[in-house]
């Protein structure tokens, strides 16, 4: 005889309230439009280029150092939510605007770090949280090493200390620095992006996939090749043990661009690092998991008060 407890719900189960429905994913284009409407746009006439930056929100300063490609609009959904708790700042790299005066051949990776400190001084920021993504993590780590007292905590996602490039790839980078236009005209761009990231955008996020392709295609080729060339010559391993700042390492467990070994190398070398492996996440959580990414960043940088977390449901 079948066990009736397996086929008939108990009174307690029948009376239990239904699980709340997950909210629909945010509309990325609407989020970007809102960010454009609300963010303050400024320009800093730095020693190497006229830097365009955007500021949104009130609270402790948080500087987001972006990845190697795409535009600030790809981070808009994350920034909109972080702006509820932080004064967020994001900026454009040299060469992103044709009139910014950047002479890319003269700009080193250390210069990019200098520019972060120049922007901080320009905005009269004392101490700030740093959040670096992908290529931006290399600038973040160097900044933490150079002046750790200015940064109480930092978060890096898709981080690495070094990347290997083949001779053919290095040659392609040199040629790329001479090409006009944006990455939208590069052959095989969509096929490569699809291989690396498409499976991390389920059907419910189809609009975000198209937006990602669009924004990625707006990246100018020459400055992108310049940044890739900087990465090809970079090795941060010697400075990692001397970084005393608390660092949270976020790594997608399905990241096809930055392999897990890079995360493990950083976790072993940084004295005060914590690591989080994000399930079912690739290299673009600011697109695929923007809302959750913002919550993780906010809750780790500003831990809960003794009376409870702001995101916890009330009993």
What is the meaning of each model-derived region?
Residues 1-62, 85-86, 302-315:
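Alpha/beta-hydrolase fold catalytic core
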Residues 45, 49-98:
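Conserved HGGG/HGGXW glycine-rich cap/lid loop of the alpha/beta-hydrolase fold
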Residues 90-131, 295:
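Active-site loop/oxyanion-hole signature of alpha/beta-hydrolase fold enzymes
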Residues 145-146, 151-182:
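Flexible "cap/lid" loop of the alpha/beta hydrolase fold
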Residues 165-167, 185-241:
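Conserved alpha/beta-hydrolase catalytic His-Asp/Glu region
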Residues 243, 249-251, 255:
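Short beta-strand/loop motif that positions the catalytic acidic residue
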Residues 245, 259-268:
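Short alpha-helix in the alpha/beta-hydrolase fold that links the catalytic acid
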Residues 273-315:
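Catalytic active-site module of serine/aspartate enzymes centered on a nucleophile-bearing elbow/loop
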